[in-house]
Amino acid sequence: MKNKRLLFITLSFLTIALFSCQKMEQPGLGDFPKDSNPPGGPLNFYVAFDGTSSDPLRNAVDSIRASFPADNPLTSTAGSSGQAIKGASGKFIKYAKPNDWAVKAASFTVAFWAKGNGQTLNNSGTNGPEAVFSFGSAHNAADWPNTTFLIFEGDNTKCAIKFYVYSKTGDKWFTWEGANMIAGIRDNQWRHYVFSYDAATSTMTLYINGVANPITSVWGGHGGVNIDDSKITELRIGRGPRTDGDADGAGGWMQSSWKGELDQFRMYSTALTAAQVSALYASKL
């Protein structure tokens, strides 16, 4: 018995020593925030933008898989919590994919903090929409098959919000426009936005600062969103799905970028409940 105990202690020591050496040999990735989410959990993509490195790629690491963006030309600024990113005309942060979000999502939620000041502008500097995020698409026509994107358009008096989703079986505009445009959200103040699609009811709910907008948008019995992951060529934060040189030109609404600030960008493969949205807003993260 004594010999067995000695052998166990010796093996335990060697195991600890081995893993310690392996950890020391790994290159440091730097510190980045990790959200409370178990492996394989519903939070599939999360960027806090809280990095303080001189390397902009490290400042935009996805915390779910420690994935670096392919490009980040945007500058850091004070955020809703810690640091954020400042949008710029024609620029965006490029990621290979939103991880496995499209594969797993039947219901889904997109959440972020944003700040905008006055009239939204296109990339030519005239009135037009500004895109929070989009998927680059394998389709290169003048329309927008296989992409998904979110745009704001308007000023502080009234602003439209439009969330477009393209699935394997159809497409849908979830909109708050016309008589349902939203006042007071372009006043250069941070606000928390959550878009929660529930496959059970085919309904999209918009929350602003933890409060549900009374206008919901229904996708006529569509059910699970069913996005084709194989058609997503990149995830863009801060710009629409089209690029310079496309047929719609520099002022084109589908390539317009976000000119304000963005922070704490999350994508879930589940529909957050009202209580979960309220808790997320209250956390200020």
What are these regions (language model features)?
Residues 2, 17, 21-90, 231, ...:
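Extracytoplasmic low-complexity segments
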Residues 29-39, 88-108, 176-183:
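Short surface loop/edge beta-strand patches of beta-sandwich-type extracellular domains
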Residues 45-52, 109-118, 252-284:
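Extracellular, beta-strand-rich glycan-interacting domains
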Residues 50-56, 117-120, 168, 199-202, ...:
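Acidic glycine-/aspartate-rich tracts in secreted/extracellular proteins
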Residues 112, 188-197, 206:
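Short tryptophan-centered beta-strand motifs in secreted/extracellular beta-sheet-rich domains
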Residues 128-168, 224:
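Glycan-recognition/cleft segments
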Residues 164-192:
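Short, aromatic/His-centered strand-loop micro-motif at the edge of beta-sheets
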Residues 216-260:
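Flexible glycan-contacting loops in extracellular carbohydrate-active proteins
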